[in-house]
Regions:
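Active-site and donor-binding regions of nucleotide-sugar-utilizing enzymes
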Residues: 2-255
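Conserved catalytic-core segment of nucleotide-activated headgroup transferases in glycan assembly
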Residues: 252-269
Length: 269
């Protein structure tokens, strides 16, 4: 990949503050299939009446959705801790958490271990205020509208609108949650294994966020990928791949014992 192409790719990529809106396996497949890493240069296209009307409906429902989440948290027992240094977002694989404990000095009494994809799991540790929820929802709606008008193809716009209610309410709640963590300790570190919308919420709350890969990586779509503080991978080829496509995160290779006796080892796949 040429340096010139890489620079063009980065320059025309969706700004990091808006990428959370595009988190969707369907959108990612479309972007990668079309090799559409970058957006049209002209912003502020006019939305069709159908898209505008449906998006307005989604926005209205989003206010009811976050109010429901606000009330729901009071029916869940909170195990709040005075000081938090780490939050591990468990993606359900098991070995992703093991990687975190192996690499970093984690203190269990100052750590939240959260099921990354369950809002109820976040509610077990912190409660969020309705004012902050509402403020973040309004900001999220603005972000969503900006992306809708960026000039993506109609199939991507349709998916954006279809996923709007889920993405708006989920991201809004997560961002408000991570702001609570930041207020407790701005030096808290978030560890995750590619939980994308959760990562965006943490990063945009100004928290250091580390992505721990548990296996070989696939192709990365820069329009969706979060700007992690650091990334851990298994091979130098993966490290070079991230560096070549213009990812600005610090990329590290997992430490390993060098194999010098090639004729006395068995590798199991």
């Amino acid at each position: 990949m040429s340096k010139e192409y890489t620079n063009k790719q980065i320059d025309q990529c969706v700004p990091a503050a808006y990428r959370w809106t595009l988190v969707s396996s369907e959108i990612e497949k479309l972007l990668l299939k079309k090799n559409n890493y970058f957006i049209q240069e002209k912003y502020e296209i006019t939305l069709t009446k159908k898209v505008s009307a449906y998006f307005l409906f989604v926005c209205i429902l989003s206010f009811f959705s976050i109010f429901y989440l606000y009330l729901k948290q009071f029916f869940i027992i909170v195990n709040r801790r005075i000081k938090i240094e780490s939050v591990i977002l468990d993606t359900g694989r098991g070995y992703d958490c093991n990687n975190v404990y192996k690499l970093f000095k984690i203190k269990n009494d100052k750590t939240y271990l959260i099921n990354a994809f369950s809002i109820d799991s976040y509610m077990q540790y912190e409660r969020v205020g309705i004012f902050n929820l509402t403020k973040n929802l309004i900001n999220s709606i603005y972000d969503y509208k900006v992306v809708l008008k960026m000039g993506f193809s109609s199939d991507i716009v349709d998916i954006l609108v279809k996923n709007g209610l889920t993405n708006l309410s989920t991201y809004t709640y997560l961002k408000t949650f991570f702001e609570e963590i930041r207020n407790k300790n701005p030096n808290s570190i978030i560890y995750t294994s590619t939980a994308l919308i959760q990562s965006h919420a943490a990063i945009l709350s100004n928290l250091k966020t580390v992505n721990i890969y548990h296996g070989l990586i696939g192709k990365v779509c820069l329009n969706i990928y979060p700007e992690y503080y650091s990334i851990y991978v298994y091979s130098f080829d993966e490290k070079r791949y991230f560096e070549n496509i213009g990812v600005t995160s610090k990329v590290y290779v997992y430490p390993a014992i060098k194999n010098k006796l090639h004729n006395k080892n068995v590798i199991l796949f």
